[in-house]
Each structure stands twice: as structure tokens, then as C-alpha cells.
Amino acid sequence: MPKYFCDYCDTYLTHDSPSVRKTHCSGRKHKDNVKMYYQTWMEEQAQELIDKTTQAFQKGKMGNFGGLPPNGMMMGPRGPMPMMPMMPVRPMGMGGMLPMRPVPPAMMGGGQVMMMGPRPGM
């Protein structure tokens, strides 16, 4: 029967069954090893980026960060900010509710139009 090898923990599991792998992968030591692996990998990637940037800067391939920006990159003076429309202020006694509008008598029946008959006495 083949054994399962965990690359993160650098160990063989006793059986190659899904339940054994699931138990192993949910363990604290395995999770710590996975976290450490990816943390180390990210640190290596960051260091490579730093090294490449340093080499490019030393070779003169990076732009000059000091002084004035290239022509056309200067920003002129800014004008005033446009005013945003203000919401009307309601008195505090309203409690945040919108004012109620009277419902037309023809629309009172659950959204169905009610037919108005002749008035009594006509």
C-alpha cells in the first residue's frame, strides 16, 4: 500500500486514505508548517524584488526620483472644489420618517383600482 508524503511536514503518513490525510491536514503542527512555508516563500520573493530593484538602480536604469518632474507633468493651481447639493434639513421631531401622502381613494384596495359608483342620493 503506497504511503502519502506531506511536503510541508516532511513526513510520510501511515496510510494513503482520505480520512488519514484529512486528519493530518487539520492538525496544528501541519497548519503551522504550512504557515511557515508560505511566510518563508513570501520573504524570499520580497528579498528578490529588493535585490532586483537595487541592481537596476545601481546600473542607472531607474529614473531620477529627485528634482522636477518631466515636462508636462507639472500640475497647475487647483480651483475651488465644486459644491455638493445639500439635503434639506428636517426638524428633529420627525424621527427620520418621510412625510405621508394621502392615498387616492381609487388605489386603496391592495394595489387594485376600485371602481367608484354613483353617490347615494344622486
Curated annotation (Swiss-Prot):
Component of the spliceosomal U1 snRNP, which is essential for recognition of the pre-mRNA 5' splice-site and the subsequent assembly of the spliceosome. U1-C is directly involved in initial 5' splice-site recognition for both constitutive and regulated alternative splicing. The interaction with the 5' splice-site seems to precede base-pairing between the pre-mRNA and the U1 snRNA. Stimulates commitment or early (E) complex formation by stabilizing the base pairing of the 5' end of the U1 snRNA and the 5' splice-site region. Keywords: Metal-binding, Nucleus, Ribonucleoprotein, RNA-binding, Zinc, Zinc-finger. This is U1 small nuclear ribonucleoprotein C. One of its GO terms (molecular function) is U1 snRNA binding. It is found in: Nucleus. InterPro entries: Matrin/U1-C_Znf_C2H2, Matrin/U1-like-C_Znf_C2H2, U1-CZ_Znf_C2H2, U1_snRNP-C, Znf_C2H2_sf. Gene3D superfamilies: Classic Zinc Finger. One of its GO terms (biological process) is spliceosomal snRNP assembly. It comes from the Eukaryota. U1 snRNP is composed of the 7 core Sm proteins B/B', D1, D2, D3, E, F and G that assemble in a heptameric protein ring on the Sm site of the small nuclear RNA to form the core snRNP, and at least 3 U1 snRNP-specific proteins U1-70K, U1-A and U1-C. U1-C interacts with U1 snRNA and the 5' splice-site region of the pre-mRNA. Belongs to the U1 small nuclear ribonucleoprotein C family. A zinc finger (Matrin-type) spans 4-36. Its main location: nucleus. PROSITE patterns: ZF_MATRIN. The keyword Ribonucleoprotein applies. HAMAP family: U1_C. GO terms for cellular component: commitment complex; U1 snRNP; U2-type prespliceosome.
